[in-house]
Amino acid sequence: MKNTKQVIALASAAALSVSVLAGCGGAASDATSESTSTATAEASNTAASDGTLVLAETGFEGKFSPFFAASASDQDVIDLTQLGLLGADRKGEMILNGIEGETREYNGTDYTYYGTSDCVVTENDDGTVTYDIKLRDDLKFSDGEPVTIDDVIFSMYVFLDPTYDGSVTMYSTPIVGLEEYRNSMSTLSKLIAEAGEDNTDYTNFTEEQQKAFWDAVNDGGVKFAQEIVDYMMANGATDVASAAAGWGFDGLAADATAKDFFLAIGEQYDWSFSAMEAESAGSALSELIPEDVYAYSTTGVNVGNAVANVAGIVKTGDYSMTLTTSELSTTMIYQLQMPIAPLHYYGDESLYDYDNNSFGFVKGDLSGVRSKTSTPLGGGMFTFSKYSDGVV
């Protein structure tokens, strides 16, 4: 992808002051103990500034979504425009009392950190761990809509959806019921690939879909793998097997073909075409296979008994919830730095009914969420204004 110089103009949001978390994975906002600090120590709903921040970076891909931002430059935009559920201090340690704030020392100076929520972590006698989350009740998104726990739950379910293929890995945590929720659905691409090219059972997909998939593999998929082989052979590899091994895919047969190599890549990435793009030696996979087939990897298909919710995610109030893991996880608390994305913008409010296991979209269909990839909306310090090649 071309790395052309792009510009982002971000107008300051009136929703929150800088004492609130700036975005996913960012440090909690703070105020120093010294009078020279420029950070505010109290949260308010007044405008932070009437200025405009212009970002000029070379790595923008235009995926300014809290769910699908991939490049570091795109993530910079997310950090500025989104609220994080939890934040961290200057040492990277989590802030669990963000509502009232926590004071911590760093290099001889005391800093008080504020955030969007409090989190109490309890290790239970049965080995499970419960995270009691209490959200502030005075937060607003940049369009003036209130931030509630429903926005948090919606965001979690997007990250945990079986067809989610973004960079956030919350789906790998031991949340109670998550494995059952995800395993009750598979992607169309994975089902067809695992069935094999000679399959005759069309219970979960049509014969036409199967043919389209394997036609794409035999054409664009082979070309994708062959580009890697050509690159590796120009750098010392002698055949497909040695090229694949040099690329990190050991174990292919001595007489392996480019198709065998592509199948190994697909298996490695659970047949997520967007994830497989990481192995490109030149062309994007999306340029080599038909758009409708590419979408197979984000098309959910129910398999077995459908599981409608994640048992470990429980709403307890308009601004509170609990999340329970089956065991102590060193990464779970860091996953809670997730962005709180507005349900009313990224989801479908008519499809949100917590009591009836509906969470703002149809399970296995994130098309509505994906459609809002280029223009972010959140509750961070800035609102997104414009993205173009020139200076705004």
Where are the language model's segments positioned?
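Bacterial lipoprotein signal-peptidase II cleavage site
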Residues: 21-34
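Hydrophobic core
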Residues: 16-20
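Short, well-ordered beta-strand elements
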Residues: 49-59, 129-134, 152-155, 320-323, ...
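N-terminal lobe/hinge region of extracytoplasmic solute-binding protein
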Residues: 56-126, 377
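N-terminal low-complexity, Pro/Thr/Ser-rich intrinsically disordered segments
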Residues: 34-55
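Aromatic- and charge-enriched surface segment that lines or borders ligand/interaction sites
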Residues: 117-282, 322
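Gly/Pro-rich hinge or "lid" segments in bacterial periplasmic/extracellular proteins
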Residues: 90-93, 274, 278-310, 318, ...
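Bacterial Sec-dependent N-terminal signal peptides
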Residues: 1-11
